[in-house]
C-alpha cells in the first residue's frame, strides 16, 4: 500500500 510505513517516524 502507498500508506505503508517505509521509514520510522523520526
From Swiss-Prot:
EC top class named in words: hydrolase
A single GO BP: proteolysis
Organism, scientific name: Philodryas patagoniensis (Ringless green snake)
Temperature section of the record: Optimum temperature is 37 degrees Celsius with azocasein as substrate. Incubation at 55 degrees Celsius for 90 minutes reduces activity to 20% of its maximum.
Single GO MF annotation: metallopeptidase activity
Family, as annotated: Belongs to the venom metalloproteinase (M12B) family.
GO-annotated cellular components: extracellular region
pH profile of the protein: Optimum pH is 7.5 with azocasein as substrate. Incubation at a pH of below 6.0 or above 9.5 results in an abrupt decrease in activity.
Assembly and interaction partners: Monomer.
Keyword check for Metal-binding: yes
The protein's name in its UniProt record: Snake venom metalloproteinase patagonfibrase
Activity regulation (record text): Inhibited by DTT, EDTA and L-cysteine, but not by the serine protease inhibitor PMSF. Activated by calcium, unaffected by magnesium, inhibited by zinc.
Amino acid at each position: 500500500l502507498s500508506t505503508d510505513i517505509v521509514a520510522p517516524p523520526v
